[in-house]
From Swiss-Prot:
Organismal lineage: Bacteria, Bacillati, Actinomycetota, Actinomycetes, Mycobacteriales
Residue ranges, Cytoplasmic side: 1-97
Entry's transmembrane regions: 98-118
GO biological process, one term: regulation of translation
Protein name from the UniProt record: Anti-sigma-K factor RskA
Source organism (scientific name): Mycolicibacterium vanbaalenii (strain DSM 7251 / JCM 13017 / BCRC 16820 / KCTC 9966 / NRRL B-24157 / PYR-1)
Membrane topology of this protein: Single-pass membrane protein
GO CC annotations, alphabetized: plasma membrane
Domain notes: The cytosolic domain interacts with sigma factor SigK.
Length: 238
């Protein structure tokens, strides 16, 4: 049985994505007022991390649609009849709302998304599936030397999304290497050279497996098969 405090924290992601009804959001606001300071702080920290992550994903993936797209979308809206959608249960509606909110931010097409709602939805990206997962978790931590790293992950989807904000790039002749750490050791999750590290940097982490942490080291160009320098940052994936 989960505690009311854990139930509250589990709603941080849909709250951050505005995927709840007004009544549900109001209930959460009241619960936050009555929650212990530590629980309220953890909830607000996760909300902030999710919104920063989605903003970074939107910035990294946004594209400028061609001018003809707007005309085509508006023409299709005018031609298509209005359809009534069936009412779904609260839990299914919430999951769909989370996926819809995540997709809208990541795709970054603003009001043009209305036109696409009238057509079959594209296959959700890994990031969208992670954010829509019922077991989605958000972990954030400070990086020595400056900046923060946030991992949004789902065991159900076996994937995660890493966002680094204001992390300085590695020194010339080195790369940052990420490692998924499990009982058998450290397994490479990719590298980032100086050109890859921007004010907001995103990366997908597939195949989390049984990893319990995401660790960072500094390695030679191209990376290493195992860590050759001390871990300078680590985020628990629990």
């Amino acid at each position: 049985m989960t505690s009311p405090q854990n139930d509250l924290l589990s709603l941080a992601t849909p709250y951050a994505l505005h995927a709840l009804s007004h009544a549900e959001a109001a209930d959460i606001d009241r619960a936050l007022n009555d929650a212990p300071p530590g629980v309220a702080d953890a909830f607000l920290a996760e909300v902030r991390a999710v919104r920063e992550t989605m903003a970074a994903l939107a910035s990294a993936t946004a594209v400028e649609p061609p001018a003809r797209m707007r005309d085509a979308v508006l023409r299709q809206i005018a031609e298509d009849p209005v359809r009534t959608l069936p009412v779904r249960s609260s839990s299914r509606r919430r999951a769909a709302a989370v996926l819809s909110a995540a997709a809208a931010v990541v795709i970054g097409l603003g009001t043009l998304a209305v036109g696409y709602a009238l057509r079959p939805a594209p296959t959700p990206s890994t990031a969208e599936q992670v954010f829509a997962a019922p077991d989605v978790r958000t972990i954030s931590g400070e990086i020595p030397g400056g900046g923060t790293a946030t991992v949004v992950f789902s065991r159900e989807q076996n994937s995660g999304v890493l966002v680094m904000n204001n992390v300085p790039p590695p020194q010339p002749g080195t790369v940052y290497q990420m490692w998924l750490v499990d009982a058998d050791g450290s397994h490479s999750a990719g590298t980032m050279d100086a050109e890859a590290v921007a004010p907001s940097t995103t990366a997908v982490l597939p195949d989390l497996g049984s990893s319990r942490a995401l660790a960072f080291t500094v390695e030679p160009p191209g990376g290493s098969t195992r860590p050759t320098t001390p871990v300078f940052a680590e985020l628990p994936l629990t």
